[in-house]
Structures are given as C-alpha cells and as structure tokens.
A protein has these predicted regions:
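Residue-level detector of alpha-helix initiation sites
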Residues: 7-8, 31, 327
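Beta1/beta-strand and adjacent pyrophosphate-binding region of the FAD-binding site
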Residues: 1-9, 25
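Short beta-strand to alpha-helix junction loop
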Residues: 58-61, 92-101, 139-158, 268-273, ...
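C-terminal catalytic lobe of FAD-dependent flavoproteins
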Residues: 149, 285-376
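Helical element adjacent to the flavin cofactor pocket in flavoenzyme catalytic cores
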Residues: 139-197
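Active-site substrate-recognition segment that forms the wall
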Residues: 12-20, 29, 42-44, 48, ...
Length: 376
C-alpha cells in the first residue's frame, strides 16, 4: 500500500491503514509535513466560510465528531501531545450592518445543526478584553477547537512509524505504474515501487504527477501567517472576523492570519501580505499594536476548481485520490482517513461522497464502482 504525500492527510490515512495490519509505504517529495500542514493555523471550524463550502458541512461535522478519539489515539501511540483544545470561537462583526450579518450566520448555523449563540458586544468584551471598539455584533461558537499543526504532524508521523509505516523522505513521485487499467505502483525519481493500491494525498502538488491532472486539478493558494507575542494580551479562545483571526497557542504565542493568494508556487512572505493581516488584526484587537512580531511564514493550500476536496476511487483500479482539501486539511484529516480506509478495505464507504468524486472533473462520467474493488 503506497500513500503519496506525507502531510496531515497522507499521514492520517497511513496510520489508519497500518492499524488494519497493511504494509504501508508513505512517500514524500521532501520532508513529511513541511508544506500546507506545517503552515496551518490549526482552527477546527466545521461551519461554511462561503456558499461553495455548503456541501462540505456534513463531512466537516463528522470529522469534528471523530476528532477527540483521533487525537487520543495519536497521542497514545506517539507519546506526544498535539495542543488540541475545544475552547470555542468568538466571531465578531465590525461592519455597520454587523448585527444583520451576525443574525444571518446564526440562522445558517442553526439550520445546519451547528452550535452557535448570538451574544452582546458587552459579553464578548467581558470574555476577551482585547476586542476593539469596532465590534458591532458577536456570536459564540462553543464546539470549535484548535490544535498546533506542527505538534500534530510530529505526533502523527511518530505514531505511524510506531505502527510500522515505512516513511520515505525526498521521494518525489513522477507517475503511476499501470498494468492495463490497474494501478500497480509508482515511479519515483530514484526507483519503481510496486503496490496493490495507491492513494494520492500530495496536496497542491498532486496535479504535477504525470497523468493525474484529470482527477486532481489542484493548484496552490498561498496563505501567509504571523506569530505574535504580547505581555499585555492573553487570549483564552480564538477570535475571528471577516478580515483576520487570532488563535492562541499553549506557549503563549498568538497566530494571526491569513491571506488567500493565487501566487503559483511562490511560498515567500510579502510586505503586502503582512500589512493585510495586521490591518485585520489591529481592527479585531487593537491592544496587539505593541505586540512583538516573532515569526512570519507562508504555505500553499491545495485549491480545486470548485473549492471542494477530491476523495475516492478513480476509474483506474487501485488508484485513489485524497487531495484538494484547500483550507480544511487539518479539520478533515480524521474523516478522510476513515473514508479512504473504507474504500481500500471494503470497496464502499458509509458516507455520501458524490460531491467529492475525482471523476467530477473528467469527461467520462462512468461509475468507478469496479475500480474501487477492495484489496484482496
């Protein structure tokens, strides 16, 4: 069993399949977990951030349901912590029509059976004194959580290794090996590796693997983030507006983000990106104006044409996709691992996934049922 890509998605799938006693080889083009997973802020928010994301909500809710067990298992197998905390989010609305925007969000979340409560600005400021005077309305989202993605990746890779996953660094995959209509392995820069099944979880690099663009037309979307330290501001929970978010870490740092940029594979931090983030941050929490800016970085999210992930079997037997998670890779890791394990082991998952099929981008609309035959 080969997993192509060692980020949070690939590592989670590898661990899940290793638990089922499969021999799993995890291949990464460089060091596992050093791309989008390393750069993420670590917010676990199942609510839709745009109309395009509505089909994702059931999947996100299921992943949130799985998260406590997922974290407990990873931490137990690795002996390491992940920084997971369900501290909730205060969502603030600063526009003149903020109350109307807040009420629309509350109605939408309630219709989707997501926990949310409209709160007054006084209640919001009592909970988080750093909130600025621009706040016109607020909502409390008690079920949302955060973790430290870098700690999670360290724990995941350790857990996978302890379960027998063979982790190969600096192993970029160039193409699939096909025997008729059956994927029988991969071609790396150095060698050929045979396998009964291959799962591609290579994020924004998936489309660059020869022949996979028709299933995984991913593209990089740059996100820049900052880390702040403040002696006068301490947050107990995530603060979020339409312009910025602030995520507290257990080490006292505050992660601020982020940008959404179509900048190709350019991963550097820019003055314009930093300014955009800081403008939103200082409107959200003006007291952070005197904070120390201790770090800045950028990552490449795997975008797709419809902003939805690409999950499941292709029309090539033994070839599966688990990519294109865009801004939701950390959030969707547990449910993605469960779904891919079901496909590989049983042929069919127990969850509606038509929205996410790799075949939605191809001209051929034939079913992938035969191609999804489980490992024998």
């Amino acid at each position: 069993m080969i997993i192509v890509g060692g980020g949070v998605i690939g590592a989670s799938i590898a661990l899940d399949l290793a638990r089922e006693k499969l021999h799993v080889v995890l291949l990464d083009r460089q060091q596992p977990g050093c791309e989008a997973s390393w750069a993420a802020a670590g917010m676990l928010s199942p609510g839709p951030d745009s109309p395009d994301a509505l089909p994702l909500v059931p999947l996100a809710k299921e992943s949130m349901r799985l998260y406590p067990e997922f974290i407990a298992s990873v931490e137990e197998l690795s002996g390491k912590t992940t920084g997971f905390a369900r501290n909730g989010v205060i969502e603030v609305f600063n526009a003149p029509h903020g109350e109307s925007e807040r009420d629309k969000m509350v109605a939408q979340y309630q219709a989707l059976e997501l926990a949310i409560e409209a709160i007054t600005t006084e209640v919001a400021r009592k909970a988080e004194a750093a909130l600025g005077p621009a706040v016109r309305a607020a909502a409390w989202l008690p079920q949302e959580a955060t973790l430290d993605p870098r700690m999670l990746m360290d724990a995941l890779l350790t857990a996978a290794g302890n379960r027998g996953v063979e982790i190969c660094t600096d192993s970029p995959v160039e193409s699939m090996t096909l025997t008729g209509n059956h994927c029988t392995g991969v071609v790396t820069r150095a060698t050929n590796i045979s396998a009964k099944c291959v799962v591609v979880a290579a994020g924004c690099f998936s489309a660059g693997i020869d022949g996979l663009g028709r299933y995984a037309p991913t593209r990089p979307i740059r996100g820049q983030l900052l880390a702040l330290e403040s002696k006068s501001v301490a947050l107990a929970r995530t603060l979020r507006s339409s312009k910025a978010y602030l995520v507290p870490r257990s080490n006292g740092r505050i992660i601020a983000g982020s940008t959404l940029e179509d900048a190709g594979f350019e991963k550097h931090v820019t003055p314009a990106g930093i300014r955009t983030i800081l403008d939103g941050v200082l409107e959200l929490a003006p007291a952070l104006a005197s904070a120390q800016l201790v770090d800045a970085w950028a990552g490449l999210r795997p975008g797709t044409p419809d902003h939805l992930p690409i999950l499941g079997p292709t029309d090539i037997r033994g070839l599966y996709m688990a990519t294109g998670h865009y801004r939701n890779g950390i959030l969707l890791a547990p449910v993605t691992a469960k779904l891919l394990s079901r496909w590989v082991l049983n042929g069919t998952p127990d969850f509606e996934t038509n929205w996410f099929s790799p075949l939605r981008f191809t001209d051929a609309k034939s079913s992938a049922t035969k191609a999804a035959t489980a490992i024998s």
